[in-house]
Amino acid sequence: SLYDIAPVTPGVAVDLSHIPTDVKIKGFSGEDATPALEGADVVLISAGVARKPGMDRSDLFNVNAGIVKNLVQQIAKTCPQACIGVITNPVNTTVAIAAEVLKKAGVYDKNKLFGVTTLDIIRSNTFVAELKGKSATEVEVPVIGGHSGVTILPLLSQIPGVSFSDQEVADLTKRIQNAGTEVVEAKAGGGSATLSMGQAAARFGLSLVRAMQGEKGVVECAYVEGDGHYAR
């Protein structure tokens, strides 16, 4: 199911339905997301305003926090057992809002709430592959710290068979942390990353489904609540 307040959403679903796959697609629009959420096992939230040049992710909080809160309230009522992936920026705070809404509704499960940071991983894979002359399919960079600028931390030392100088580590880390800004500035006010984010969201969602279906060894990085001293 696809859902957005925009009336174009059912038309997008029709467009997608013409692609020859086994997936059945329905589109829903309007203020009520309930019809799209009924029976859902996985919900990915990407709704919200996009960055413009000169903005950072935290500038989106005032608008996007309310959007996430509203959607998660509807999830808590309609499909409280669903796994939720939050893509909406700023991820490090919208995930916390989602957690508080779910706690208030009495349905919070930290093992089912994820801040989707896969975009940082695919960017890291691309940049490392370019630098080292490898195929991007050969590289998998674990990235921790969520998705808020300087908190994005690629673990470059954990890539098998690849080594870096201190300068390469510094340059790569900075580029990965600022890759979103690179896209925003290149689009000159026309929005932020959409196509690469779509690929990242699809990868994370499909990994989640594969794991839920019992496949072993499925590993993805995400922004989640831990078990340590600083866990919420």
UniProtKB/Swiss-Prot annotation:
- Protein name (database record): Malate dehydrogenase
Highest taxon of the lineage: Bacteria
Q: State if NAD is listed as a keyword.
A: yes
User: Where does this protein come from, organism-wise?
Assistant: Klebsiella variicola
Q: Which residues bind NAD(+)?
A: D4, N64, I87, T88, N89, M197
Sorted alphabetically, which InterPro entries does this protein's record hold? Lactate/malate_DH_C (IPR022383), Lactate/malate_DH_N (IPR001236), Lactate_DH/Glyco_Ohase_4_C (IPR015955), Malate_DH_AS (IPR001252), Malate_DH_type1 (IPR010097), NAD(P)-bd_dom_sf (IPR036291)
Q: What does this protein do?
A: Catalyzes the reversible oxidation of malate to oxaloacetate.
Q: What class of enzyme is it?
A: oxidoreductase
Q: Which NCBIfam families match?
A: MDH_euk_gproteo
Q: How does it assemble?
A: Homodimer.
Give GO BP annotations, semicolon-separated. Answer: malate metabolic process; tricarboxylic acid cycle
Keywords in alphabetical order = NAD, Oxidoreductase, Tricarboxylic acid cycle
By sequence similarity, the record places it as follows: Belongs to the LDH/MDH superfamily. MDH type 1 family.
Any one of the GO CC terms = cytoplasm
Residues the record lists as binding substrate: R51, R57, N89, R123
According to UniProt, the reaction catalysed is: (S)-malate + NAD(+) = oxaloacetate + NADH + H(+)
One GO MF term on file is:
L-malate dehydrogenase (NAD+) activity
State the EC number(s): 1.1.1.37
Q: Where is the active site?
A: H147 (proton acceptor)
SS bond partners: none
